[in-house]
């Protein structure tokens, strides 16, 4: 009998009331996107200082770092500790998928530069352009590489400079770095492949209620999803292929 494959999710955000009520928390949101039958998915709420033992990292096939309301360039203890773990996972040649904050933190840990987004925050359905020559059609993207992909965006920071040896995989009219990879170890995505319309709208409503955005910004953000949806199935394929297959993403 094949040994059960294990994956670890670093949760860098608390569960919203909506996420808990609707999905049982963000753990389940991620597993619904990335998980397969027979796998074990463990979560550690790193934003609350909950981390796995270093000796236990070896037993996991792959790792996911979630989004967060915190800035990846902050020097709080849990963020610095997560940076150290990223470096250890790199040394171990482990697969690490970085989402939003995770995308930014991996860039920081690997020597890149992260800062407040120069063109302002995004809370919307965005369209990103794939750098076709940077990916091989027969690998994680499948037989055909699309020119563009839609993805839900929810962030106020950005990667300004890629780490050495990083490969740019996607960009947009708003941001120069929407997706990148480093060797076969890291795949990093600024958007949220795990989000859907309901999750985005709940975030917009909460941010609006907190006074962080204005009503017209909230309405414009929601309007981006009136006629279109995120390419969730395609993102699911990319992320699962990265975490669970061996071929290189790089040309």
UniProtKB/Swiss-Prot annotation:
Could you tell me which pathway this protein works in?
Secondary metabolite biosynthesis
Is Lyase found in the keyword set?
no
Q: Name one GO biological process term.
A: proteolysis
Instruction: Identify the catalytic residues.
Output: 100, 192, 194
Domain Glutamine amidotransferase type-1 positions: 16-213
> One GO MF term, please?
peptidase activity
Transmembrane ranges, per UniProt, are none
Matching CDD domains: GATase1_1
Q: Where in the cell is it found?
A: Cytoplasm, Cytosol
Q: Name one GO cellular component term.
A: cytosol
Which terms are listed as keywords in the entry?
Answer: Cytoplasm, Hydrolase, Protease
PROSITE patterns, alphabetically?
GATASE_TYPE_1 (PS51273)
Q: Enzyme group, top EC level?
A: hydrolase
The catalytic activity of this protein is classed by the Enzyme Commission as 3.4.19.-
Instruction: Decide whether keyword Hydrolase is in the record.
Output: yes
PANTHER family, per database record: GAMMA-GLUTAMYL PEPTIDASE 4 (PTHR42695:SF12), GLUTAMINE AMIDOTRANSFERASE YLR126C-RELATED (PTHR42695)
Q: Name the family.
A: Belongs to the peptidase C26 family.
Q: What does this protein do?
A: Involved in glucosinolate biosynthesis. Hydrolyzes the gamma-glutamyl peptide bond of several glutathione (GSH) conjugates to produce Cys-Gly conjugates related to glucosinolates. The gamma-Glu-Cys-Gly-GSH conjugates are the sulfur-donating molecule in glucosinolate biosynthesis.
Protein name, as recorded: Gamma-glutamyl peptidase 4
